Every structure is written in C-alpha cells, then in structure tokens.
Amino acid sequence: MLSAEEKAAVTSLFAKVKVDEVGGEALGRLLVVYPWTQRFFESFGDLSSADAILGNPKVKAHGKKVLDSFCEGLKQLDDLKGAFASLSELHCDKLHVDPENFRLLGNVLVVVLARRFGSEFSPELQASFQKVVTGVANALAHRYH
C-alpha cells in the first residue's frame, strides 16, 4: 500500500494535526458539502446552515472522535481491515451507513489537510494521504462485502 517513505511522511505530518480542530472541520464540511449525510446526525441539533454545522459542538466532538479513530488506524497501516473491523461492523450492522460516505469523508479530510498545511501538503504527500484514506474507507466498508 505505502512505501516506508510514504508512511514516514504521513506519520510526520499527522503528528502536527490538531485532531479536535481538523476532525470537527472535516465532519462539518462533509455535512455541508454532502447534505444527505446529515440524516445520520439528526440528534446533533441545528444543522440548518454551514455556520450552524461548523459551529455545532456535537459535530466538533464527533469529528474529533472520528479523527481519533483514524489516528489509531495510522498505527496499523499494514492491517487497516483489522484496525477498523469493529467500526466496520458497527457502521454496517447497527448504523446502516452507506459505505460511500467513508470515501467522501476521506476526500474531505484531504481537502482540510491541504487547506491547513498549504505548501507543506505537497502533491506527493497528498497522493500518500489519498492512499491512506482510500485504505481506511475500504477497511470500513469491509463488513458490507
């Protein structure tokens, strides 16, 4: 999946990520850009506008939780299916989340990282992160197959 150099680059950049901020922004952007995903978060209160979503403390808290799980997965880049097995089961069997949403969230995360890290987020680093988020999305969708 990733070369040793790519793993090192991804790990190095992710060590600088402010999980609470990036997670909240990524989930918030997902809900704004892909509004049909809001149906999974109806209990979060006001999701009526971009400002409401991005300022919603429940969105921020859940975004942090999502990114914390992503960080744990980064520790097991060679076994993403194993790392995300229980979350795949939860999202498939209990929450019935469309697995396409995992890919969408991964792509939004890449956008947020590019926005926050600017020129440091080189095309090569983006390519490495894209491999990671694709791997995570596939691992989360594994239970669906």
Swiss-Prot record:
Pfam families attached to this UniProt entry: Globin
Domain of life per record: Eukaryota
Protein name per the record: Hemoglobin fetal subunit beta
Keyword Heme: yes
Gene3D superfamilies: Globins
Residue intervals of the Globin domain: 1-145
Source species: Bos taurus
Binding-site residues for heme b, renumbered to this chain: H62, H91
UniProt keyword GTP-binding, yes or no: no
Function: Involved in oxygen transport from the lung to the various peripheral tissues.
